[in-house]
Swiss-Prot record:
The keyword Zinc does not apply. Gene3D superfamilies: 2.30.30.790. GO terms for molecular function: structural constituent of ribosome. GO terms for biological process: translation. Belongs to the bacterial ribosomal protein bL19 family. Pfam families: Ribosomal_L19. The keyword Cell inner membrane does not apply. InterPro entries: Ribosomal_bL19, Ribosomal_bL19_CS, Ribosomal_bL19_sf, Translation_prot_SH3-like_sf. NCBIfam families: rplS_bact. The lineage of its organism: Bacteria, Bacillati, Mycoplasmatota, Mycoplasmoidales, Metamycoplasmataceae. It comes from the Bacteria. HAMAP family: Ribosomal_bL19. This is Large ribosomal subunit protein bL19. GO terms for cellular component: cytosolic large ribosomal subunit.
Length: 121
């Protein structure tokens, strides 16, 4: 009985996003509150981790800003995440791309693949 109730509550909070996976370059629009004002900030980078766990699914995006690696973890179904855009899909053979942290320059390149259509999660 409790499992069904939890499932019903969770299903109302799940949001639809384009399908993406580790190795994809994404642009994440998320809300930031500064004082009493709310604005949308964009974080663009490579998805190095994606954990699917129902309502608490999360993903880590890494980008290089001023020669410093910046990583940010986002909850997929958070109300603070406005939208996620897939910019480019890359061919990878791992689920977690932690080895990309050590790479820079040409060694950090990934081979692009073409996706015909994006499906919703």
């Amino acid at each position: 009985m409790q499992a069904k109730l939890i499932e019903i509550l969770e299903s109302s909070q799940i949001r639809l996003y384009p399908q993406f996976q580790p190795g994809d370059n994404v642009r994440v629009y998320f809300k930031i509150q500064e004082g009493n004002k709310t604005r949308i900030q964009i974080f663009e980078g490579l998805v190095i981790k994606f954990k699917k766990n129902g309502l608490s699914s999360n993903f880590v995006v890494r980008k290089i800003s001023h020669n410093v690696g910046v990583e940010r973890t986002f909850l997929l179904h958070s109300p603070l995440v406005e939208k996620v855009e897939v910019i480019r899909s890359n061919k990878v053979r791992r689920a977690k791309l932690y080895y990309m942290k050590k790479r820079s320059g040409k060694s950090a390149r990934l081979k692009e693949i073409k996706r015909k259509e994006l499906k919703n999660l």
